[in-house]
């Protein structure tokens, strides 16, 4: 499989790309992520004691940065007001290449109006796989997504297969992730079907079923996707 290049408003990324999702120890391990095979770094602002750390990370790594301040209802740790959460993301956009905002976030449209970098609009379901995934993807694109991220939790191989079929059927910049025990293999396999990104960890998982960056790099190389 040949790498494809994704162009997000001038930001060029070779795909499938491995995103290192970094939490509380982001500043300490950011430089290590690249050496282990990451192509992009996600800074989970909701897991940081001080979200301003992202500016220090920006000065120490050359990889593109995704800023995420995950809302509690979608698996995140941010506990403040939505206004404050959006304000943190807006400030972080000055040091980021991509901003992640949830499709269902009350402050989504306000944020999108106030950032100039590409927007990754995300949707998470930690309990299953909704029947209307295609509609959710379409809603995200209509909302202004430059890239759509869908993270769902299949409970059977049939559901996992249905997720892969969506990657073949939908024509938009899309990342699909399988969470949980049944969905774990999709983190390595979905890129073969067109998922542009896959997320891994450096020191510890930030989502159910997440593999390490090193494991993903090895798996994708074995499968001919890198």
From Swiss-Prot:
Positions with a binding annotation for 3-dehydroquinate: 21, 42-44, 70, 187, 206, 210
Matching Pfam families: DHquinase_I
Residue positions of the active site: 124 (proton donor/acceptor), 149 (schiff-base intermediate with substrate)
GO process annotations (BP): 3,4-dihydroxybenzoate biosynthetic process; amino acid biosynthetic process; aromatic amino acid family biosynthetic process; chorismate biosynthetic process
Known pathway: Metabolic intermediate biosynthesis; chorismate biosynthesis; chorismate from D-erythrose 4-phosphate and phosphoenolpyruvate: step 3/7
Catalytic activity, as annotated: 3-dehydroquinate = 3-dehydroshikimate + H2O
UniProt KW keywords: Amino-acid biosynthesis, Aromatic amino acid biosynthesis, Lyase, Schiff base
GO molecular function, one term: 3-dehydroquinate dehydratase activity
Domain of life: Archaea
UniProt xrefs under InterPro entries: Aldolase_TIM (IPR013785), DHquinase_I (IPR001381), Type-I_3-dehydroquinase (IPR050146)
Protein EC: 4.2.1.10
Enzyme class, broadest EC rank: lyase
Description of how the protein assembles with itself and partners: Homodimer.
Role description: Involved in the third step of the chorismate pathway, which leads to the biosynthesis of aromatic amino acids. Catalyzes the cis-dehydration of 3-dehydroquinate (DHQ) and introduces the first double bond of the aromatic ring to yield 3-dehydroshikimate.
Family: Belongs to the type-I 3-dehydroquinase family.
PANTHER family: 3-DEHYDROQUINATE DEHYDRATASE
Protein name: 3-dehydroquinate dehydratase
Originating organism: Methanothrix thermoacetophila (strain DSM 6194 / JCM 14653 / NBRC 101360 / PT)
Gene coding for it: aroD
């Amino acid at each position: 499989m040949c790498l494809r290049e994704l162009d997000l408003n001038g930001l060029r990324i070779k795909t499938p790309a491995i995103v290192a999702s970094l939490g509380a120890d982001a500043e300490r391990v950011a430089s290590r992520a690249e050496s282990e095979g990451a192509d992009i770094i996600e800074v989970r602002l909701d897991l940081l004691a001080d979200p301003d750390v992202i500016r220090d990370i920006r000065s120490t790594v050359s990889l593109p940065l995704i800023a995420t301040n995950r809302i509690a209802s979608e698996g995140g740790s941010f506990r403040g007001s939505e206004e404050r959460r959006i304000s943190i993301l807006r400030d972080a956009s000055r040091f980021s290449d991509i901003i992640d905002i949830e499709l269902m976030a009350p402050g989504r449209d306000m944020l999108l109006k106030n950032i100039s970098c590409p927007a990754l609009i995300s949707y998470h379901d930690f309990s299953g796989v909704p029947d209307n995934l295609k509609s959710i993807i379409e809603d995200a694109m209509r909302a202004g997504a430059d890239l759509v991220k869908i993270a769902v939790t299949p409970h059977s191989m049939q559901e996992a297969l249905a997720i892969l079929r969506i990657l073949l059927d939908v024509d938009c910049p899309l990342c699909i992730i399988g969470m949980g025990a049944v969905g774990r293999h999709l983190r390595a396999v979905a890129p073969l079907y067109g998922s542009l990104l896959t997320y891994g960890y450096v020191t510890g998982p930030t989502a159910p079923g997440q593999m390490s960056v090193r494991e993903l790099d090895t798996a994708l190389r074995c499968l001919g996707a890198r």
